Amino acid sequence: MRAFLYATIVFGLVGFLLGLTAALMLFNPELPEFFFGTDDATIKSLQSGNLQGLINTQGAFGFGRIRMLHTSAVIFAFVANGFFAGAYYSMQRLLKTRMWSDTLSWIHFWGWQLMIVSVVITFLMGINTSKEYAEHEWPIDILITVVWVIFGVNMIGTIAVRRVRHLYVAIWFYLGTWVAVAMLHIFNNLEVPLSFGGWKSYSAYAGVKDALVQWCTGTTRLRLF
C-alpha cells in the first residue's frame, strides 16, 4: 500500500526532527527557556495553560517527553510503517495475488496511524509507563495488539490464496516476524491497570525480571523490523 510508504516518509522526517531537537536540548538543557523565558512555577503554568510552562524543561515539550516521542516516532511510525509498506508490496508480487482483504488493509493502516496519534497525545500529557521503547500505556498496547492481529490475518489469508506453490524465504521471515513481535509485545506489556477508567498501570514484573523482559523486547523488536 502506498499509504504506508507516504506515512513512512512523513514520520521519518518528524522522527529525525524530534531527534535533532532532543539532541540540542541535551546539549543545552536550558535551550527552551532561552527562547521562551524561565518560570519557577512551571507546574502552575501548566495547570493554567501557559505556553511558557508547556515549553520549558518540565512541561509537555521538555526533553523527557520529546525524547520519548523521538524514539517512538522512529520505531513505531517510521520503521514500522516502512516494514508494512515493504511487506505489502513484496507479498503481492511474490505470491502473485492481491492482498486477501483490501478492507483489512485499510483498517490496518488507519488503526496504526490512530495508535501513533494516541501515543503523541498521551506522551505530551505525561501519560506513560516509563519503560523505554514501550512507554505507551495499556489502552494503546491493546490497540497495537488488535491492529497487529489484523495485519497477521490479512497476511495469512493472502498466503492461503496465493497463485504459486512455493513460499519465498522473505514470506517465511514475515511470518516469523509477525509471531515473534506479537509474543514480545504481549509479554513485555503485561500490566495491571490501576483502574479500567484511567490510563495508569503497573508492570506485571518487578526489578531485574522487568529489565530483562523489557530489553529483550527493545532490542529484538528493532532487529526483527
Identify the residue ranges that each predicted region occupies.
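Inter-helical turn/loop segments and adjacent helix faces that build the functional surface
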Residues: 158-166
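Hydrophobic cores of alpha-helical transmembrane segments in multi-pass integral membrane proteins
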Residues: 2-30, 41-97, 102-126, 139-159, ...
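Short, flexible helix-coil linker/hinge segments at the edges of structured domains or between repeats
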Residues: 196-210
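Transmembrane helix-loop junctions at the membrane interface of multipass transporters and ion channels
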Residues: 126-132
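Charge-rich, acidic-biased intrinsically disordered regions
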Residues: 33-35
